[in-house]
Amino acid sequence: MSLIQVSNLSFTYDGSFQPVFENVNMQLDTAWRLGFIGRNGRGKTTFLKLLLGELHYQGSIHASVGFSYFPYPVKDSSQLALYVLESICPDFLYWQLLREMNLLGVPEEILYQPYNTLSNGEQTKLQLAVLFLRENQFLLIDEPTNHLDMLGRTLVSRYLRTKSGFILVSHDRAFLDGCIDHILSINKANIEVQKGNYSSWWENKQRQDAFELEENRKLQKEITRLQETAREKAQWSDRVEATKIGQGPCDRGYIGHKAAKMMARSKAIAGRREAAIAEKSKLLKNIERADSLKIFQLPYHQSTLVRLQNVTISYGERTVCRDISFEIRPGDRICLQGPNGSGKSSLLRLILGEAIPHTGEVRIGSGVRLSYVSQSTLGLGGSLRDLARDQGVEESLLLSMLAKLGMAKTQTEKDLESLSDGQKKKVLLAVSICQKTHLHIWDEPLNFMDVISRTQLEELLLTFKPTILFVEHDKMFCEHIANKTVTLG
C-alpha cells in the first residue's frame, strides 16, 4: 500500500488574511478512486496545485508517486492529436492508447486530425486515455465533465471505474456515484475523508446534520432552563440573606447556612450551564447554509411564448439540427437534450435573436422578455456594482442572492475576473434569477457549480415553477426539473 501523507498543511494566498488551509492532516491511499467535493471557493483546485508543488506552503506532503494534472496544458494545439498525446506521454505504446480510446468510445482516425479541430469532449477523452498510460502517477482530474454530454459522462464514469489512483473534482452526483470509492470533502470547518460514493456521503451528512440540529435544540433548551433556575436560586439566596438582619444568633446562623447551600447549588447549576454551552459550541460547525432562493419571473398572459416550426440550422454544408418543432408555454420547464454538436446552443441563440443561419419559422410572443445564461464564463470582469447596473438588477438583491449561494462578502467585493469559474457561474445565475423576465434560457447552468448550489437551484425551480428552457447534462438535475424534453440528434 502506497500513501500520500499530508501533515500540518497550511496555506494562505499573498495579500489575504484568511487561510485556505490550516494545519491539515490526512492520509490518502494511492489506490483510491477519490471524489473531491466542496463549495465553490473552498480551495479544491488550490489543494491540487499544492500537491503539484506549484504553490509555496507550510507543512509537508510526502508521496511515493508523481502527480499528473488534467486538463493537461497543450502548448501547440495546431499539431495532430497524436503528436499532442506524445508530448504528454512520450513512451506510450500505440496499441495501449487504442485500447484506452476504445474504452472511451473514441475512433482511431481522430488521432490524425489537428488537435484544435476536435470537440472539447474528444479532447477530454484523449487526454484521460494518455494520462492513465503514464507510469507511477496519481492523477488529479479537475472537473472533466464540463465539456461532456450525457452519453460522454456515462462513458467516462464507467472508464474511471476501471482505474485506480486518482482524485476527481466533480459536482455531477450521478457521475461521481458511478466511479468513486472514497470521498474527500472540504467542509466549513474541516477536511474529511469517507469511504463510499457521493450518495453515501450525502446520506451520512444529512444524518449528522439532523443529529447536530436536534442536539443543539436540546442543549439550548437545557441552557435556558439552567439560566432560569440559577436566577431563581440567586434571587432566593439574596432574599434570605436580607432576612438575617434583626434575627437572633441561632436564626441568623441557620438562615446563613441555608443561603450558603443555595448559593452552592446555584454555582453547580452555573457549572452545568457552562458545560452545556461548551458542548453546544462543538455543534453545527459543518452545517452548510442553503437558504431558499426566490425567482422574479413575470407572468405571461398568452398561451405561447415561443414557437419553432420545422427549424433546420446549418453552417455551410454542415447541418447541425433538422426539422425541429416545439412550443414553450407558461410553466414549461423544457430540457433540450442531445449529444455534443447537435445544435443545442445554436438553437438557444437563435431564440435569443442572434443571426444563426436557419430555415423554418421562429416566433417569439409579443413583449416576451428573455434572460440568458451562457455556458461560458469568459469575459466576466469588473465590479459587481457595474454588472448589476448594466443588467438592470438591484445590487442589494444580487448581493443577497449570492450570499444565499454561499459567496462571502469579501468575494463579491473582488474584480469578477479574479473569481473561480464556479463563483463566476453563480454571479451569472444570480443576475438571471434577479431579472424580471418571462422566460429563462440557461445553457449548461451547472458547469462549475458545487453540489449544495445545485440542490438550491433544484429547490428554486420546483418551488416557483418558472418557465425555463435549458441545456444540461447533469442526469439527476434533468430528471428532477424537466417536465418536457426536446431531443436533438
Q: Residues of each region from the PLM?
A:
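ABC ATP-binding cassette signature C-motif
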Residues: 1-216, 296, 300-489
